[in-house]
């Protein structure tokens, strides 16, 4: 096995980044600007995981500019991210992408997208700015301490005989995705939280094809309000994704109770003033028509004047306290995972492992995951910047 020592630049450091995803590539871009010799390792196509983000439009960030308020959108990592976001905020993200040649706009829901509405375009802009970064299409098998640096053993993805290659680096940045294998770190005593699906649709015991595709706007679960989509397997959409993130480590089955119309409804008054209307026509002002029969059955077809107090209360209970039993997640839908390197192992001011000098961790490699809306990419950009700053300051 040939041992290749990467040439040190004027900075006195040469850096390996393992994982050519969002965080790894941006970290490489920032480090090359500082004059470092940077090598990216990934067995697949760089930035391939960026392509499906934001429905293919690439939701770069969220227009939340206070770092503490921004951090509230991460079920795992909120306090850890205070320091990170105070150093690299949403403002900094906009400036970064302007520098990369990516123009942006903010939607009414505060999500920030490229004006091209194309993740492919963003990918191309980032890669075009990595002119001085070497990209190795190799799978890293092992990292070992070697003198004052690190030895990386990797297998070329294109090699039929799987010949092992060895490299020497002064610094290593772990920026792999949450679905990746952490076995290459087995020589280091690091606590790693096994990945679980996050931001994923939920399979429920209660299923009905007749309501598949129905969306309830601004439904509420335990103080969280967002749109809820009913599907053939259960529930999906923004509210379901938030719940899946919060409850990523809960055991199945578990129950959820939804308020489908959080605003108070004076149903008795509506029944009294519309005595000859069917109940479904009265309720359709508050919830989608296609959901009413599923919730209350044949009561939907009864005239308002025939509804007694007990039936009225039953209707209200279905509107304000719909109970669903979650039995699993929708396999193959997840794009984000809960899990990764335990945050107790990381210095939040530098992204460096506390036990091992000159090894840094960023992005989804960390046990950090956020809600839908650009939050996970914000974590990728911000932690990449903090790692770059730490290496620059101490090199």
Predicted regions and their residues:
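A short, basic/flexible loop-to-alpha-helix module at the beginning of a structural domain
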Residues: 1-12
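Predominantly flavin-linked oxidoreductase catalytic cores and closely associated redox partners
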Residues: 120-121, 126-288
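Conserved N-terminal/central alpha/beta ligand/cofactor-binding core
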Residues: 48-131, 139, 288
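Residue-level recognition of phosphate/Mg2+-coordinating polar/acidic sites
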Residues: 66-68, 86, 92-110, 171-175, ...
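Beta1/beta-strand and adjacent pyrophosphate-binding region of the FAD-binding site
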Residues: 10-23
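Glycine-rich FAD pyrophosphate-binding loop
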Residues: 16, 32-55
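Residue-level detector of alpha-helix initiation sites
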Residues: 21-22, 45, 179, 366
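A conserved FAD-binding loop/helix module that cradles the flavin
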Residues: 176-183, 367-394
């Amino acid at each position: 096995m040939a041992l290749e020592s990467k040439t040190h630049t004027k900075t006195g450091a040469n850096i390996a980044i393992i994982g050519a995803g969002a965080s790894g590539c941006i970290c490489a871009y920032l480090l090359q600007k500082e004059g470092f010799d940077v090598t990216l390792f990934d067995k697949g196509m760089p930035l391939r995981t960026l392509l499906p983000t934001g429905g293919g439009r690439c939701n770069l960030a969220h227009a939340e500019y206070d770092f503490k308020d921004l951090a509230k959108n991460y079920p795992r990592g909120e306090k850890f991210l205070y320091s990170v976001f105070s150093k690299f905020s949403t403002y900094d993200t906009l400036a970064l992408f302007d520098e990369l040649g990516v123009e942006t706009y903010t939607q009414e829901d505060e999500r920030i997208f490229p004006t091209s509405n194309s993740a492919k375009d963003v990918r191309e802009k980032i890669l075009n700015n990595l002119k001085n970064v070497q990209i190795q299409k190799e799978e890293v098998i092992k990292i070992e301490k070697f003198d004052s640096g690190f030895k990386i053993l990797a297998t070329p993805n294109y090699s039929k005989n799987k010949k092992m290659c060895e490299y020497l680096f002064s610094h290593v940045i772990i920026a792999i995705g949450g679905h990746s294998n952490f076995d290459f770190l087995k020589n280091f005593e690091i606590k790693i939280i096994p990945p679980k699906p996050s931001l994923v649709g939920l399979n429920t015991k209660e299923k009905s094809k007749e309501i598949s595709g129905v969306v309830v706007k601004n439904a509420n679960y335990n103080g969280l309000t967002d749109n809820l989509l009913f599907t053939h397997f259960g529930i999906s959409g923004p509210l379901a994704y938030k719940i899946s993130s919060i409850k990523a480590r809960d055991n199945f089955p578990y129950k959820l109770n939804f308020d489908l119309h959080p605003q108070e409804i004076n149903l008795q008054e509506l029944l009294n003033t519309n005595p000859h209307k069917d109940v479904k026509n009265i309720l359709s002002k508050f919830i989608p028509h296609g959901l009413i029969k599923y919730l209350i059955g044949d009561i939907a077809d009864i005239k308002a004047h025939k509804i007694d107090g007990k039936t009225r209360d039953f209707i209200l209970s279905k509107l304000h306290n719909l109970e669903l039993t979650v039995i699993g997640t929708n396999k193959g839908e997840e794009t984000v995972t809960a899990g990764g390197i335990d945050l107790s192992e990381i210095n939040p001011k530098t992204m460096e492992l506390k036990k091992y000098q000159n090894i840094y961790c960023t992005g989804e490699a960390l046990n950090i995951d956020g809600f839908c809306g650009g939050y996970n990419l914000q974590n990728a950009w911000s932690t990449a910047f903090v790692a770059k700053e730490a290496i620059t300051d101490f090199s």
